[in-house]
Amino acid sequence: MEAYIRQKRASPGMVQASDLQINRPMSGMRSNSRELHAYDGPMQFISSPQNPDQILTNGSPGGITPVAVNTSRNHSNNMRSLSTINQEADLIEEISSHELEDEESSPVTVIEQHQQSASHSANSTQSQKPRARQHSFSDNLDEDDYTNRNVAAAAPVRPAGMASSPYKDATLEGSSNGTGNGTGGESEGDVIGNIDQFVMQPAPQGVLYKCRITRDRKGMDRGLFPIYYLHLERDYGKKIFLLGGRKRKKSKTSNYIVSCDPTDLSRNADGFCGKLRSNVFGTSFTVFDNGNKESTESPRLDLAVIIYDTNILGFKGPRNMTVILPGMTEDDQRVKISSADPKQQGILDLWKMKNMDNIVELHNKTPVWNDETQSYVLNFHGRVTQASVKNFQLVHDSDPEYIVMQFGRTSEDVFTMDYRYPLCAMQAFAIALSSFDGKIACE
C-alpha cells in the first residue's frame, strides 16, 4: 500500500507542494541603483519561460497552501472539470490582489480592524527606534503625479499604514504638564476671534489643527501660477476658510502672497498676512509677516526659514528639509526677530552662526525604505492617501515622535495639512507652499 501511495504521489498529474523557485520575468521598470522584482498581475504566473504551466506562490493568504501544477501528461489523462479551472483562476486572482495591495496608499481599500491593529503595532515599534537624520541629497524629480508607487529610483514618500485615530502614538511636548499623549490628551482646534488674528497666533499646547489645501489650476495663467486655498476642517464635512496664496508673476525669485481675503490676493489688500520669498535656486525660503520693511514702529518680522538640501550630484531619495522658527517665550508667544532691523540678525543669520538661543530647528522625519513596496514610507495615520515627493512630517530632534506638522497628498489637487504648537496657520501654510515651488538645485 505504501509503495502504491508513493507511486501515486510521484505521478506528474497530481497536485503537490513544491519549494522550487523559478526565475520569473522581472518587471518592465528599471532603475540605475536597484532592480525591482515584482508581480505584474495574474499573467505573471503563466509568462515564465522555464515552465509556462507551473504556478508557484510565495505566500498563502487565507490559509491556502502553495501548490505547483504540472500538466505534462497526455491530454486524455489530465482533463479537468470546468469548476476546477475556475477555482484555479480564482486562486490566481486572489493571490495577485493580495500581493499587490498595500495598506494605505490605495484610498479605496478598506482594511479590516485586526489588520489596522497589526499595522499600527508594527509602525509603533518602528517609530520607537528613531533613525539618525540622513544628510543625503534629495531626489531629482519635479513631478507632482506619482501614479506608480513601485519605482525605486523615483520613490516618493508615501503612507505606511492606517490607524484608528490620527497621531495616536505622538507624544505632546507638554506631556509633563498633564496634556497627555496622542489624541487622548489633545483636542481638535477651532477658529477663535477674527481670522486675520487667528492665523498669526501660535497653536495652543494640546490642540491639533486639521486643515486642507486645495490647488486651483483652472484658468489662463493658473497652470503656471495656481492659487492655493487653506481651509480648517470641521465635523460633517464642513470647512472654514483661513488663507489663500498665489505666486507673483513679475518677480525675479519665487514670491508668494498670502492673504485671508480669497477675493484679493495682493500686497495692498486689507487681508494681506505675509509673504514667502525664495532665493535664486529655490533652496531657501523666508516667511515674513505683513509688516513694513522700512517702518520702525511695525517692522517686518521673520516668521520662518525653510531650507532644502541641495542635490548637485543627482542622488535619488526623498527631500530633506530644515525649518527654523522663532523661539517661544514662557507665555507661549513668538520671539520677535526681524532681518529688516539693522540692530538685530534675522533667523537665517542666527542659524548660520549657530546662535540657537532664540530659534527652534525642525527637520523632516526620515522615511524608511520598504523592500516589499520598493518605496519610502511614513505613517500618516490615515491623513494622507497618495504617494508624493511632497509628503513630509516635521519633528524636533529631541522628540521625534511629536509631529509638529505633517503635509501630504490625498488627490490630484487636494492635500492635508495638520499642525500643532508652536506653529501658527500662517507659518504652516507657507511651509506647505514652499514644497509646491520648483527647486532647480534640489530636483
UniProtKB/Swiss-Prot annotation:
Biased composition (Gly residues): 177-186
Name recorded for this polypeptide: Protein king tubby
Pfam families: Tub
Modified residues (Phosphoserine): 136
UniProt-listed InterPro entries: Tubby-like_C (IPR025659), Tubby_C (IPR000007), Tubby_C_CS (IPR018066)
Location of the region described as Disordered in the Swiss-Prot/TrEMBL record: 57-85, 98-189
Record GO biological process: protein localization to cilium
Biased composition annotated in UniProt, kind: Low complexity: 113-128, 148-160
Assigned GO CC terms: ciliary membrane; cytoplasm; nucleus; rhabdomere
Compositionally biased residues, Polar residues: 68-85
Cell compartment(s), UniProt: Cytoplasm; Nucleus; Cell projection, Cilium membrane; Cell projection, Rhabdomere
PROSITE patterns from the UniProt entry: TUB_1, TUB_2
Family: Belongs to the TUB family.
Record keywords: Cell membrane, Cell projection, Cytoplasm, Membrane, Nucleus, Phosphoprotein
Record's bilayer topology term: Peripheral membrane protein
